[in-house]
Each structure stands twice: as C-alpha cells, then as structure tokens.
C-alpha cells in the first residue's frame, strides 16, 4: 500500500463527502456559513485529489495548476470566510480585521525574499488593500453592523478572482510542474511571485479566522468565570474603548483558562453546549492543516500529506459534533437519517442565555453584538 497515494486519496474522499453533507444542510437551512464552508471543503478535496492522482500517474501541468489554486491558495481563505458568516452578528469582526491586517503585513514583509523577486509593487498593493478592508471591517463591527462579513467576502472573493487571472496569464517552464526531489510533494517554485504572495494572504486570513473563531465561540458558550473585566460597548468614551479593545484578547485568554474547570464539570454533567467541543476540534484541525502547510514551505514536505489528512479529520469531527451545523445527520440529499434530531441539552441553553446577559450594553464582557442572542450566531 503506497501511502503517497492512499493518504491524499482518503483525504480527498473525506473532504468531498464533508462538502456534500454541508451542501445538503445548506439546502435545508440556508445558512450562508454552511454554503461557504462547503465550497471551501470542495477546494480541499480537489487539492488532495490532485495529489493522489499525481502520486498514482505522475504530475501534469493541469494537475499542478489545479492543485495550487484549490489546495494551496483558496481552501483556508474560504473556510475562514465561513467562520466570518457564522459569527457575523458578533464582535468577532475585530478578530477577522486583525487576521486580514496580519495577512497583508506578512505579505509585505516577505517581499524581499528571493522567491518573491519580481513581484514589483504588488506586495505593497496587497498590504494597502488588506489594511483598508481590515479598517472597514473593524468600523462596521464597532457600529454593530452585521454587514462586515460582506466586506470579508470581498477580500476572499477578490483574491480568488485575482488568483484566477494571474494563473491564466502565467507561463510555466517545462515540464510545467515542480516537486520536492526527496519526497515528491509539489512545491510552488514555478509560479509567478504575484500569485505566490496570494497564498500567505489567504492562508493567514483564513487560518487565523478559523482558529480565533473557534476560540471566540468556545469562550462565548462555555460557563465563564470572569477574572478580568472588559467592555466593548461603543457608547463608552473613545479612549476607554481603545483601551478595552487592546486588553480584550488578554482578558479573554485569562477568563477562558479560569473557566476551564467549570467547563469540564459542565461536560461531565451533560450541560455543555455542543459549540464548545465542536469549535475546539475545528481549531485543532485548522492548526494541524496549517502547520503541515507551513512546514512544507520550509522544506519539511514529509509532513504535508499527514497534516492535511489529520486536518480534515478534526474539521469533520468538529462540524459533526456541532448541533448548530448538523442538527440532523443523514445521508445527503435523502430522507435517510443516521440518528434522531439532535437538541442542545437544557443546561447548555441556560449557559447560552447567561452569555446573553453578559452581552448586555452595560455588561463587562461583550462577546457578541448588541441585542443579538449569541446562540443565534448563524443568522
């Protein structure tokens, strides 16, 4: 059994099956986040499928181009965008704005690396675009407008369209593909730097959004012990708001750690909202997949396939655990149920209601948007 073929093939099958299930859930419930996640998982599956086909029959220029766009450029960005739509009615917009800004900043800072020689002014343009969009998302979030995911979508969709244009105009030297001679894993060395810079732009934005979104949701839905207080009430004086915005990540981290014992007790008692374990699994999946991709960029390509396989396993498990995403688990596009309709435990709903109380304008812990029940993040 050749793992170079089996591992990406199984990864592709799991990702595409996952995408099919998400499309089915979207067809019934019309959750925008389900549709966007489904698109992201289709890209994940196609990218892994290209690797399996190449391992079995050799690389071609068509496979190489398809692999790079779907697997290396698009997947993480679209999965992160799905998280933005899931949390579109909350203050998570600040986190997405930070993800966008860091992606643009990284793209600009690496412009002088040898592999990006010839990129010209594109790194600066990417940075400016990311900065402006990040500012716009933050402003929309500040005024509690749930339109900020549309701005997030403009970044991801815009980068996707640009990557298509750059790919269509790129001429690759023979043989039309490049692989690591030691492991046979594909590498992006043949693509123009303007296109290659879109990879960290979308990957950092998407991976950070997935991981931060998982931490955000875990914090909102876990029984909280508030050790450090903060407020993101937009009605407070500007200097106080900026101070609270600055300390919010530290306060959330401290409060999250302090809340872990109570969360463990709620889990044992069957009172924990499904969003908590689900989002932890999703965060682990995003981290593992991103880690494998990052290591491959530094020449350690032997972890590339394993990282993608483990990533899709954790992501799939996280989404299946989430009652919000899969209230009914069934064979896609049929009425054949694989179990009964699932409901959150009564204790979990009380914990979610407690999160609403903490979210009041005069509260000290604004995890969500004003007047928006946090258990209805999906819209």
Predicted ranges, named:
Residues 212-221, 255-359:
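C-terminal transmembrane-bundle signature of multipass membrane proteins
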Residues 1-28, 137, 204-223, 246-262:
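First transmembrane helix
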Residues 28-41, 91-100, 147-155, 272-282, ...:
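Membrane-interfacial loop-to-transmembrane alpha-helix junctions, especially the N-terminal start
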Residues 44-49, 102-112, 159-167, 284-292:
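Aromatic-anchored segments of alpha-helical transmembrane domains
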Residues 354-379:
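Long, low-complexity, intrinsically disordered segments
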Residues 142-159, 215-284:
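Membrane-helix boundary/juxtamembrane motif in polytopic membrane proteins
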Residues 3-11, 114-219:
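Extracellular-loop-to-transmembrane junctions of the mid-late helices
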Residues 1-15, 31-134, 306-313:
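Individual alpha-helical transmembrane segments in multi-pass integral membrane proteins
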């Amino acid at each position: 059994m050749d793992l170079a073929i089996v591992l990406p093939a199984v990864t592709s099958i799991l990702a595409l099956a996952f995408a099919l299930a998400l499309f089915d859930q979207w067809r019934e419930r019309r959750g925008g986040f389900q549709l966007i996640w489904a698109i992201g998982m289709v890209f994940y599956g196609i990218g892994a499928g290209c690797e399996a086909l190449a391992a079995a029959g050799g690389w071609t220029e068509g496979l190489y181009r398809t692999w790079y766009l779907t697997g290396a450029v698009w997947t993480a960005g679209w999965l992160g965008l799905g998280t933005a739509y899931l949390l579109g009615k909350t203050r998570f917009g600040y986190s997405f704005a930070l993800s966008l800004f860091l992606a643009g900043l990284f793209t600009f800072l690496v412009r002088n690396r040898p592999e990006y020689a010839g990129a010209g002014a594109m790194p600066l343009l990417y940075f400016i675009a990311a900065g402006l969009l990040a500012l716009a998302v933050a402003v929309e979030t500040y005024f509690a407008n749930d339109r900020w995911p549309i701005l997030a979508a403009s970044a991801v969709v815009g980068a996707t369209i640009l990557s298509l244009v750059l790919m269509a105009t790129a001429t690759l030297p023979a043989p039309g593909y490049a692989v690591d001679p030691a492991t046979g894993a594909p590498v992006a060395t043949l693509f123009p730097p303007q296109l290659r810079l879109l990879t960290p732009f979308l990957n950092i934005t998407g991976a950070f959004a997935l991981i931060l979104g998982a931490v955000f949701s875990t914090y909102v839905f876990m029984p909280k012990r508030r050790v450090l207080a903060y407020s993101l009430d937009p009605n407070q004086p500007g200097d106080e708001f900026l101070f609270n915005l600055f300390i919010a990540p530290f306060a959330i981290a401290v409060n999250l750690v302090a809340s872990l014992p109570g969360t463990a007790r709620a889990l044992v008692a069957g009172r924990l909202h499904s969003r908590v374990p689900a989002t932890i699994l999703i965060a682990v999946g995003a981290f593992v997949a991103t880690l494998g991709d990052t290591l491959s960029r530094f020449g350690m390509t032997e972890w590339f396939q394993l990282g993608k396989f483990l990533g899709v396993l954790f992501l799939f498990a996280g989404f299946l655990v989430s009652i919000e995403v899969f209230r009914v688990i069934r064979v896609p596009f049929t009425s054949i149920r694989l179990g009964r309709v699932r409901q959150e435990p009564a204790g979990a709903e009380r914990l979610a209601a407690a999160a609403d109380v903490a979210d009041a304008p005069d509260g000290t812990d604004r995890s969500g948007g004003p007047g928006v029940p946090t258990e209805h993040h999906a819209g």
